[in-house]
Amino acid sequence: MNLKQIAKDTAKTLQSYLTYQALMTVLAQLGETNPPLALWLHTFSVGKVQDGEAYVKELFREQPDLALRIMTVREHIAEEVAEFLPEMVRSGIQQANMEQRRQHLERMTHLSLSNPSPESEQQTISDTDWDH
């Protein structure tokens, strides 16, 4: 397991996601102030935001002002969430893992109760014999 590569890949994915969030913010703003430009940006962006850096690079060729605006918003979002993100990721994964384990245990328990094995039926019969 190459932790350094995992960290780099995670950072790139997060960067692309923040680019997407910045795009959504800019689209909302433009929807109020310049609907034709919002429509152009939406049309331009369809299917292109998976790689945030390639998207910004291509947008620079078409509309440099919009590329700069998205980069500015993306940087602002990153600054706002960076402080909380590591702990939120850790605790989110811990809680999700605990919930998955709980659900798995409930399913296993439910299966055991609804389909008892012959040994457990024999054990139940033996247990009731002790009562007499």
UniProtKB/Swiss-Prot annotation:
Pfam families in UniProt: RbcX (PF02341)
A GO-annotated cellular component: carboxysome
Sorted UniProt keywords: Bacterial microcompartment, Carbon dioxide fixation, Carboxysome, Chaperone, Cytoplasm, Photosynthesis
Compartments it resides in: Carboxysome; Cytoplasm
Residue ranges, compositional bias (Polar residues): 111-132
Entry's Gene Ontology BP terms: carbon fixation; photosynthesis; ribulose bisphosphate carboxylase complex assembly
Signal sequence bounds: none
Sample GO molecular function, one term: protein folding chaperone
Predominant place of localization: other
Region ranges (Disordered): 110-132
Superkingdom, taxonomy of origin: Bacteria
Task performed by this protein: An RbcL-specific chaperone. The central cleft of the RbcX homodimer (RbcX2) binds the C-terminus of an RbcL monomer, stabilizing the C-terminus and probably preventing its reassociation with chaperonin GroEL-ES. At the same time the peripheral region of RbcX2 binds a second RbcL monomer, bridging the RbcL homodimers in the correct orientation. The RbcX2(2)-bound RbcL dimers then assemble into the RbcL8 core (RbcL8-(RbcX2)8). RbcS binding triggers the release of RbcX2. When rbcL-rbcX-rbcS or rbcL-rbcS were overexpressed in E.coli no change in reconstituted RuBisCO activity was observed, which suggests RbcX plays no role in RuBisCO assembly in this system. However in PubMed:8472962 E.coli chaperones groL and groS were also overexpressed, which may compensate for lack of rbcX.
NCBIfam families: ChaprRbcXCyano
Domain characteristics, as noted in the entry: The homodimer has 2 functional domains, a central cleft essential for production of soluble RbcL in which the RbcL peptide binds, and a polar surface which plays a role in correct RbcL subunit arrangement.
Assembly mode: Homodimer. Interacts with the exposed C-terminal peptide of RbcL via its central cleft, contacts a second RbcL monomer via its peripheral polar surface. RbcX and Raf1 can bind simultaneously to RbcL.
Family named by the database record: Belongs to the RbcX family.
Protein's name in the database: RuBisCO chaperone RbcX
Species of origin: Nostoc sp. (strain PCC 7120 / SAG 25.82 / UTEX 2576)
Lineage: Bacteria, Bacillati, Cyanobacteriota, Cyanophyceae, Nostocales
Gene responsible for this protein: rbcX
